[in-house]
């Protein structure tokens, strides 16, 4: 079986959720797991090999090292310390995880890897920027998961509120993947119609405020109940991998290197992008209301401050 070769760095719940989702989509011919924890790495390889035996399209699963990455097409990085229970923010994770990401980036660069990297380690916008700076890879080939999951939560919440299918909802969360993210109401649509067609004009601001609070609380509530989030980001990231490896030119909300969009340069945060085998084919800039512009400016400031703290 010939096809793309996919590797993950970090075989925790997020990495293995991504890998299993990628396997069920039959995205690759070979899947390699890299992890500093040799015992966990091999255990996950065995478990996924058992799963693959029931479905020949799953591909081959192996344990590997950074030195083997040269001929791989796609890497998913989720390694790092996870958020602690009790309301720890993603940005509080920054200091330790920056050093972990620097180490990973150096090893991947040394391997000669020339494919696309998708990063989900938190705080993801800073981790993605760290990886890009250390590797010096082409910016279109370095992608953060950004507000991918936030946007999925927004679509789910809108669909649930108005009793519609989430497939018919077009709505985005942009900016930092964290507490300063910006839910875009001004351009949100269901089946091409603005939300005002589904809600009383007097209620829409209140209703959207409730939806916005739902998506902001969602991750913290999951972490408080089960310790971590992983199925949502794993599945959403596998979907991004599919759009890239199959060269679909479809739009997903990920974190590219900004080059002036929204007045932001040399930083990464969530915005809709066209995805292709190149990675980022095109960055799309959404038209914002004045309120949304102010909120995004605050999100950009938060990220700038944390880039300084990371000393990049």
UniProtKB/Swiss-Prot annotation:
Residue positions where Phosphotyrosine is found in the record: 220
UniProt GO BP: glycolytic process; lactate metabolic process; pyruvate metabolic process
Pathway(s): Fermentation; pyruvate fermentation to lactate; (S)-lactate from pyruvate: step 1/1
Residue positions binding NAD(+): 14, 35, 66, 103, 120-122, 145
Keywords linked to the UniProt accession: Cytoplasm, NAD, Oxidoreductase, Phosphoprotein
EC number per UniProt: 1.1.1.27
Catalytic activity, as annotated: (S)-lactate + NAD(+) = pyruvate + NADH + H(+)
One Gene Ontology CC term in the entry: cytoplasm
GO MF annotations in UniProt: L-lactate dehydrogenase activity
Residue stretches spanning the membrane: none
Gene3D superfamilies in the record: Lactate dehydrogenase/glycoside hydrolase, family 4, C-terminal, NAD(P)-binding Rossmann-like Domain
Location in or out of the cell: Cytoplasm
Binding residues annotated for substrate, in chain numbering: 83, 90, 122-125, 150-153, 229
Active site positions, chain numbering: 177
Assembly: Homotetramer.
Annotated HAMAP family: Lactate_dehydrog
Job description of the protein: Catalyzes the conversion of lactate to pyruvate.
Family according to the record: Belongs to the LDH/MDH superfamily. LDH family.
Protein name in UniProt: L-lactate dehydrogenase
The encoding gene: ldh
